[in-house]
Swiss-Prot record:
Catalytic activity: 2 [molybdopterin-synthase sulfur-carrier protein]-C-terminal-Gly-aminoethanethioate + cyclic pyranopterin phosphate + H2O = molybdopterin + 2 [molybdopterin-synthase sulfur-carrier protein]-C-terminal Gly-Gly + 2 H(+)
Gene Ontology CC: cytosol; molybdopterin synthase complex
Signal peptide: none
Entry similarity comment: Belongs to the MoaE family. MOCS2B subfamily.
Function according to Swiss-Prot or TrEMBL: Catalytic subunit of the molybdopterin synthase complex, a complex that catalyzes the conversion of precursor Z into molybdopterin. Acts by mediating the incorporation of 2 sulfur atoms from thiocarboxylated MOCS2A into precursor Z to generate a dithiolene group.
Name of the protein: Molybdopterin synthase catalytic subunit
Gene Ontology biological process terms in this record: Mo-molybdopterin cofactor biosynthetic process
Gene from which the chain derives: MOCS2
Subunit organization: Heterotetramer; composed of 2 small (MOCS2A) and 2 large (MOCS2B) subunits.
Pathway noted in the entry: Cofactor biosynthesis; molybdopterin biosynthesis
Residues modified to Phosphoserine: 20
Length: 172
């Protein structure tokens, strides 16, 4: 049984990485610039507790926004053992009204602390602290060490942006 949590501080539809493999194959969703400009998006929180199999792609689509530049995700899975015992499955229960209320409070706390556009939280079980620390390290280290530039393309012009967090870009 897999589980998943996804929060978003957005996604930029103009990002093009021609040498990279696509994240979602055969994606039929390609909004036009007109559609993107006309959309006034309100922030949303999507909360779901389910016993059904979860799809990273489906949940990711819930948090994509043309106003933002990234989607942050955490995917938790079930370990195959615990304290030397083989785990074959998990069963879980929740008092849904209370669980949903508590997750809404968490979403509210997130919005007070960070500029997040959309949040989707799908119920998960398991330990996540080490995984989240590893993801944070990967992102911070990538930004500090990997020479990546982006080109922002506007309606009338474009501009190359260097990674200000990279050690080689600092003004010493």
């Amino acid at each position: 049984m897999s589980s998943l949590e996804i929060s978003s501080s957005c996604f930029n539809l103009e990002t093009k990485l021609p040498l990279s493999p696509p994240l979602v194959e055969d994606s039929a969703f390609e909004p036009s610039r007109k559609d993107m400009d006309e959309v006034e998006e309100k922030s949303k929180d999507v909360i779901n507790f389910t016993a059904e199999k979860l799809s990273v792609d489906e949940v990711s689509q819930l948090v994509i926004s043309p106003l933002c530049g990234a989607i942050s995700l955490f995917v938790g899975t079930t370990r195959n053992n615990f304290e030397g015992k083989k785990v074959i499955s998990l069963e879980y229960e929740a008092y849904l009204p209370m669980a949903e209320n508590e997750v809404r409070k968490i979403c509210s706390d997130i919005r007070q602390k960070w500029p997040v556009k959309h949040i989707a939280v799908f119920h998960r079980l398991g330990h996540r602290a080490a995984s989240l620390e590893a993801v944070s390290y990967a992102i911070d280290t990538l930004k500090a060490k990997v020479p990546i530039w982006k080109k922002e393309i506007y309606e009338e012009s474009s501009s190359w942006k260097g990674n200000k967090e990279c050690f080689w870009a600092s003004n010493n």
